[in-house]
Amino acid sequence: MKRKTLPLLALVATTLFLIACDDRSDDLKAISKFKDLTPPRFSDVVSHQDDVSEEWSQVDYLSGPTLQVLRTRQSPDGCEDGSYYYLVDMQEKTVQPLMNALCIADNIKLEYQEVTDPYTKEKYFEYAHDGKLMGQLLIPSNPDNQE
């Protein structure tokens, strides 16, 4: 009985792994169709799954990821080490770089958080290193997103 169970478990695990890989590829295709808010365009920097790694993700337990930070393997022009970092708003279907050229070495880790202005109710995305704010980005609504 145990001999039959082991190959079955291996088959199920392999199938789940392949489904997860395919899902990541589908997510990347969907993101490349989102509205680019500022250059460089996401689709100009990323063409397939190997070009990007997920840096950070904010997840709503009912709807899945709401915000994601994706780090690319391509370095900005004039930058020896470093990567492009893109903020992806899964609900508004927008993508924008954190900065046009965020030249940060791979060993530096950033912290991320979404902040809502208590007066205007506008949403911002902040990124910091060692507790020091490095940048703040407005998370705009997308009028083209008619869901």
UniProtKB/Swiss-Prot annotation:
Alphabetically ordered keywords of this record: Cell inner membrane, Cell membrane, Lipoprotein, Membrane, Palmitate, Signal
Lipidated residues (N-palmitoyl cysteine): C21
Topology of the protein relative to the lipid bilayer: Lipid-anchor
Example of a GO cellular component annotation carried by this entry: plasma membrane
Cystine residue pairs: none
Compartments, record wording: Cell inner membrane
Signal peptide annotation: 1-20
Lipid linkage positions (S-diacylglycerol cysteine): C21
A Pfam family matched in the record: YfjS_YafY
Protein function: When overproduced strongly induces degP through the activation of the two-component envelope stress response system CpxA/CpxR.
Family: To E.coli YfjS.
Protein name: Lipoprotein YafY
Gene name of the encoded protein: yafY
